[in-house]
């Protein structure tokens, strides 16, 4: 019997395509090595560098006058700062990078830290041991000599170096520091590995009467110690152990959830009583969403049915919600369980909770001292471990709605790095040489971008930079949009700060961050409420354009307004819980990919990307850079729970989950090399696409995996030193043969002598636009008949510290990823789904029969 014309109805499971995966050897394709010389006179440049180096290094102090401490395993040496030359004014180069090859590891000449400058140069702190001075000077001298017909030695090391200079006492500090300030505060000291060096520095610091906390964070290349003292004291200690410390940061201490309240909220007891009678508790084995916040009012009639546990990082704090004016953890948990309560209050239907909530108090109540050290990386890892000990085995995700304002998001922090470890299953004690990374449990975590407070519209409405730790690569970062614009009645002299279906004025983004060094954040948007603006242009929160949730004052004010990205994270937690309840069988990486795949831009935002006809907007207002910037403000849109869970006949989603070994030990037994890639000859609905001919169709590809972070001073300018491994995807071109596609991706694949015709790219970003992050998403928009030829995709590795840091013995480790591909023809009476599943069934039979 023929199916009814319900082409848009979502009633079909997503389509697994793992049976189409083929593993192949991967070799990085060779590139044209021809390059233009950057120096007109190399001898003069070498002489210039030698002169500057001599001044920067100074004389080696006599033993009797040497202030440096003798630390076992640490060579005595000096730190100098090098800066690259700027690119040409007309160059499209993002920056002239500090060369990776600048280091001589066998001599312990190493880059401690690097950073991007506003003039598109980069600077680095270079440690030069005393016994390596002559070696380094000799290499620079050789670089300056005429090589004759040979290649100039070390040109890749020294050619771009413009300046070498001595450092000052504050050079190791990240950000501005007042060395005269008497305040005794906590500092992060980033210490080079091995861990034994950090242990020796602890002893040295304590011998100098500096307070060092026992807690620490451990990353592959760095151990983070926490010292308590004045800036000058810490700086003096650092100058006495040059080469041991890569950088010094003020320990995170300003956690600022959006907690302002204002006028009394509008909760009423009869509303709560009526709704609570309609609520059915979730099953005991249902997924849970754990909020890491200010605690929870466990007795609240709307919280109690779904609450599966409430604890505190420090038991002395108690698990109740200590935040005044209605709490913060309680309304967050309310949104996690129910979403916005306003539509439920205006309804009469039963409410069945699909998932539970847990609360772990992460922040100390008023009157309690701050945690020591004030490192929310340490605290968050401890909190997550405690929850999992209390209720082991639960399918669980985590929500963080708090942020810190005192650290720039352009580089990883100890908090964002700690989140990346949590999510990847790589906290201290979790990494086991006998267990592949792919087999360790992973965690899904949603994190707020941080908030923009009220103020004048001219200051509030332009998107502001992210707050720490939302730059985390592995976390799903949540921004805000709003559908709320109704002013309070009777009409005052107020109007909504932004129209409905725009980015919420509370939300932050990453468009001001370097797109070659940082991930696209936020990835998605959820309802965050709006601001109201008065006649002077002043914007601020208002209950009429906020969400409604449970309040911590159960007897006095059980319902309160809740807003900003804290509310958006609560809504995201609700979405995650519902998705995990519907699909408990898939990985956290896959849940994250499906959330992003399901997202669509509201119409006013969509018009910023899409022009008339088949293509994306073009022109000066829609360059690749402008599109990247818009993504960094709006993400990939607002997720749709039905789309995330189910496909339709004209909107099919294909899903793959796979393990991959990105690297292996090379033939020399000493270096890491690329190992394997995956090809998918996709079950492509060519017949249906060709029948649609020139109709507009959209394809979305999302690749999701979790990296293990390596927090080093170089991570800010070298994404490949921060990630353990990286993956990318590329799709077969419309006119490309399968053999040509394979050889284009990997040098190890045989070439067929053909070239793809020049074709207009229909991708929003294109395969070369992604440099950082662990979730990569791109959209293809064009004619259906053109999409018919894009019937294969490759997933291949890019570098990471597993490959470059052979001494860590992780080269041959296995990773895993989720790949989601959706093809959407909304409004079209076309059955993409059935054609795809027919091909999948045929392939499965073929494999079964051998």
Language-model-detected regions and their locations in the chain:
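Secreted peptidase-domain scaffold signal
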Residues: 618-728
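Autoinhibitory propeptides
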Residues: 2-66, 101-185, 199-279
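Short glycine-/aliphatic-rich beta-strand segments at the starts of folded cytosolic domains
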Residues: 58-91, 174-193
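Substrate-binding/access-modulating region of protease and related hydrolase catalytic domains
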Residues: 196, 363-472, 485, 556-563, ...
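Subtilisin-like serine protease catalytic core
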Residues: 277-311, 318-375, 393-398, 407-410, ...
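Short, small-residue alpha-helix embedded
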Residues: 568-582
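Catalytic-core environment of secreted peptidases
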Residues: 294-318, 481-496, 501-569
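Long mid-to-C-terminal assembly/interaction modules of large eukaryotic proteins
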Residues: 696-850
């Amino acid at each position: 019997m023929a199916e009814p014309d319900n082409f848009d109805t979502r009633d079909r499971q997503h389509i697994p395509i793992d049976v189409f995966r083929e593993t192949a050897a991967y070799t990085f394709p060779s590139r044209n090595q021809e390059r233009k010389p950057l120096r007109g006179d190399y001898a003069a440049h070498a002489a210039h560098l030698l002169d500057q180096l001599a001044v920067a290094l100074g004389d080696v102090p006599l033993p009797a006058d040497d202030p440096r401490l003798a630390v076992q395993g640490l060579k005595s040496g000096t730190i100098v700062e090098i800066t690259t030359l700027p690119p040409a004014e007309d160059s499209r180069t993002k920056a002239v990078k500090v060369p990776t090859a600048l280091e001589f590891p066998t001599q312990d000449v190493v880059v401690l830290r690097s950073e991007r400058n506003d003039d598109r140069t980069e600077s680095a702190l270079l440690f030069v041991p005393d016994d390596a001075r002559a070696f380094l000077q000799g290499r620079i001298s050789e670089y300056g000599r005429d090589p004759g017909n040979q290649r100039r030695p070390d040109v890749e090391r020294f050619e771009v170096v413009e300046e070498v200079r001595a450092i000052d006492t504050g050079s190791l500090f990240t950000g501005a520091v007042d060395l005269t300030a008497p305040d005794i505060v906590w500092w992060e000291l980033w210490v080079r590995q091995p861990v034994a060096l950090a242990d020796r520095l602890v002893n040295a610091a304590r011998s100098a009467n500096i307070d060092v906390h026992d807690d620490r964070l451990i990353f592959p290349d760095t151990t983070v110690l926490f010292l308590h003292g004045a800036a000058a004291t810490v700086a003096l200690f650092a100058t006495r152990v040059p080469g041991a410390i890569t950088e010094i940061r003020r320990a995170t201490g300003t956690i600022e959830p959006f907690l302002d309240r204002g006028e009394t909220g509008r909760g009423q007891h009869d509303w709560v009583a009526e709704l609570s009678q309609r609520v059915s508790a979730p099953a005991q084995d249902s997924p849970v969403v754990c909020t890491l916040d200010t605690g929870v009012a466990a007795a609240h009639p709307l919280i109690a049915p779904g609450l599966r546990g409430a604890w505190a990082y420090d038991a002395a704090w108690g698990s109740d919600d200590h935040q005044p004016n209605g709490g913060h953890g309680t309304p967050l948990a309310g949104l996690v369980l129910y979403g916005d309560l306003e539509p439920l209050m205006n309804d009469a239907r039963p409410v069945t909770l699909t998932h539970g909530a847990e609360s772990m108090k992460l922040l100390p109540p008023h009157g309690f001292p701050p945690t020591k050290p004030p490192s929310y990386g340490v605290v968050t890892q401890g909190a997550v471990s405690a929850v999992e000990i209390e209720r082991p085995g639960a399918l669980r995700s985590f929500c963080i709605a708090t942020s810190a304002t005192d650290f720039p998001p352009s580089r990883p922090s100890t908090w964002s790095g700690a989140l990346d470890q949590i999510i990847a299953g790589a906290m201290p004690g979790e990494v086991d040489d006998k267990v592949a990374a792919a087999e360790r449990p992973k965690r899904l975590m949603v994190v707020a971008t941080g908030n923009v407070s009220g103020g004048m519209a001219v200051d509030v409405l332009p998107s502001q930079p992210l707050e720490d730790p939302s730059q985390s690569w592995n976390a799903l970062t949540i921004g805000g949009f709003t559908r709320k614009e109704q002013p309070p009645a009777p009409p005052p002299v107020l109007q909504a700060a932004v129209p409905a279906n725009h980015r919420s004025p509370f939300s932050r983004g990453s468009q001001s961050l370097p797109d070659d060094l940082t991930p696209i954040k936020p990835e998605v948007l959820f309802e965050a409420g709006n601001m109201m603006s008065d006649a002077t242009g002043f914007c601020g929160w208002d209950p009429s354009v906020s969400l409604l949730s449970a309040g911590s004052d159960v007897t006095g004010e059980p319902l309160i307004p809740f807003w900003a990205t804290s509310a958006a994270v609560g809504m995201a937690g609700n979405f995650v819980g519902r998705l995990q309840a519907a699909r408990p069988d898939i990985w956290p990486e896959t849940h994250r990919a499906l959330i992003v795949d399901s997202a669509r831009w509201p119409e006013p935002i969509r018009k910023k990307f899409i022009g008339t006809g088949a293509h994306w907007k073009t022109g000066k207002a829609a360059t690749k850079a402008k599109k990247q910037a818009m993504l960094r403000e709006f993400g990939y849109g607002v997720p749709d729970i039905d789309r995330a869970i189910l496909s339709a006949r004209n909107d099919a989603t294909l899903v793959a989950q796979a393990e991959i070994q990105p690297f292996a030990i090379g033939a020399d037994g000493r270096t890491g090399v690329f190992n394997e890639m995956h090809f998918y000859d996709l079950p492509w609905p060519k017949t249906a696409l060709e029948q649609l001919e020139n109709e507009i169709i959209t394809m979305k590809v999302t690749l999701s995996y979790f990296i293990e972070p390596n927090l080093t001073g170089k991570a800010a300018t070298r994404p490949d030193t921060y990630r353990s491994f990286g993956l990318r995807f590329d799709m077969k071109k419309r006119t490309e043969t399968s053999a040509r596609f394979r050889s284009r991706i990997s040098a190890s694949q045989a070439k067929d002598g053909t070239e793809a015709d020049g074709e207009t790219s229909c991708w929003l970003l294109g395969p070369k636009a992604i440099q950082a992050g662990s979730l990569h998403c791109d959209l293809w928009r064009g004619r259906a008949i053109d999409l018919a030829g894009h019937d294969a995709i490759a997933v291949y590795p890019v570098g990471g510290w597993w490959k470059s840091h052979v001494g860590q013995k992780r080269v041959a480790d296995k990773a895993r990823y989720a790949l989601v591909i959706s093809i959407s023809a909304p409004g079209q009476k076309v059955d993409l789904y059935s054609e795809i599943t027919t091909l999948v069934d045929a392939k499965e039979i073929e494999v079964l029969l051998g």
